[in-house]
């Protein structure tokens, strides 16, 4: 997979799942089990991409994915820090694509106190990053095991 394709795939999938999982994030009913399933599916996709790219030992994918989700983490943290300022709207628009795909986990954290709601926002872009990194390293480990098996085949 070429770099431009990987970047477009990351952006496209994130926007699709953000659109599918928007219910309750801005307005409307709180997230339900459907939103949770969408979020889990989103994590599974990112894990799978990470695994495949790790098996290929494609370090550029790791760099792109880490940068992509790193920007999401930074945007979300800035939203939390500057939430009382008038520039909040533009910051939320920047972090929205990174938060919305994980909105389904709000189904599990509906009853958090107000102070913990900020933590609820911050973990949303962190989970896909961790899932991608775990997938990548599991794929890389599988690739190394496969190569070791080839050495011992007669």
Indicate where each model-derived feature is located.
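Juxtamembrane "helix-exit" motif on the non-cytosolic side of transmembrane helices
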Residues: 18-29, 52-53, 76-86, 108-110
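Alpha-helical transmembrane segments of polytopic membrane proteins
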Residues: 31-43, 65-66, 75, 91-99, ...
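Hydrophobic alpha-helical transmembrane segments
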Residues: 104-130
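Transmembrane alpha-helical segments of multi-pass membrane proteins
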Residues: 8-13, 61-79
């Amino acid at each position: 997979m070429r770099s431009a394709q990987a970047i477009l795939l990351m952006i496209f999938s994130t926007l699709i799942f953000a659109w599918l999982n928007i219910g309750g994030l801005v307005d409307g009913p709180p997230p339900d089990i459907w939103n949770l399933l969408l979020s889990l599916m989103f994590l599974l996709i990112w894990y799978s991409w990470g695994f495949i790219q790790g098996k290929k030992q494609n370090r550029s994918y790791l760099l792109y994915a880490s940068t992509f989700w790193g920007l999401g983490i930074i945007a979300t943290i800035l939203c939390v820090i500057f939430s009382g300022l008038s520039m909040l709207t533009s910051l939320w628009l920047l972090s929205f694509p990174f938060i919305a795909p994980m909105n389904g986990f709000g189904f599990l954290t509906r009853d958090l106190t107000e102070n913990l709601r900020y933590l609820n926002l911050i973990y949303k872009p962190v989970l896909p990053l961790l899932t991608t990194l775990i997938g990548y390293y599991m794929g890389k480990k599988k690739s190394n095991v496969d190569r070791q098996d080839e050495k011992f085949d007669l």
